[in-house]
Amino acid sequence: MDAVMTDPCDQQRCRVLGVGVDACRDVMASAIGLHARGGGQIVTLNAEMTMSALADASLGEAIAAAELVIPDGAGVVWALSRQGVRVRRSPGIELAHGLLRYAEHHGWKVALIGAAPEVMERLQQRLAMEMPDLRLVLSAHGYQAPEAWPALEATLKAEAPDLVLLALGVPRQETWALRVRQGQPGLWMGVGGSFDVWAGVKQRAPQWMSRFQVEWLYRLVQEPSRWRRMLSLPAFAWAVLRRG
């Protein structure tokens, strides 16, 4: 049995623009407690995803069905503060890495799915060095041929991992997890570009940018093609302000 548990009272479901998000005392404890209760889906909510959920019913459904939705973005934390809910920002990449460490120490079975083939190859090499006792039962890049996905899903169900990390991008990683995880144990979590960072292909924003809540600017410099997606940030702020 897991040594770390969390009381359900430590987790309160709030709403930002109608999209559910949980205020937790400790997101790591909440995640481990969720695993101990049979597992479920973890979503890392930021302003961009919130706006996408309002426009994409399938994404909204996946977020609503998730057992744990953590406030990944500064915008979500700010929106909650306007409701009198004080929470700390909980970057999904940090929770996911912490869960990998926990998995290594507690013998959890882990599956990693997503990112480009070369990224997955480098990630496997790095994890073998950094977490030699990690039980990696399945790893697959995210550019599989359409006909390969049913077999991949079957393997996932047969292995029944304790932790499934998906780097398939929003909304695919959330909607895919909702569909495939039905009847399955373990934690299922979308991690966006985390595999690229862990593989050393990309870098996280410097800590000072995180403190000043301008990580979005660092990501935009790394990926100029994101500029259209960034337009959701002022739209999110305006929508929150309009709600009062």
Please name every model-derived segment.
Residues 1-94:
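N-terminal nucleotide/polyanion-binding subdomain common to many enzyme families
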Residues 39, 108, 184-186:
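A short helix->loop->beta-strand "cap" motif at the edges of active sites that frequently abuts
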Residues 156, 160-170:
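Proline-aspartate-enriched helix->loop->beta-strand connector
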Residues 76-78, 172-173, 194-199:
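Short gly/pro/ser/thr-enriched loop/turn and capping motifs at secondary-structure boundaries
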Residues 77-80, 204-244:
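A transmembrane-helix-recognition feature enriched in membrane-embedded lipid enzymes
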Residues 141-147, 186-222:
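Short, flexible loop segments at boundaries between secondary-structure elements
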Residues 57-66, 174-194:
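A short, gly/pro- and small-residue-rich
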Residues 77-155, 159:
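Conserved beta-alpha
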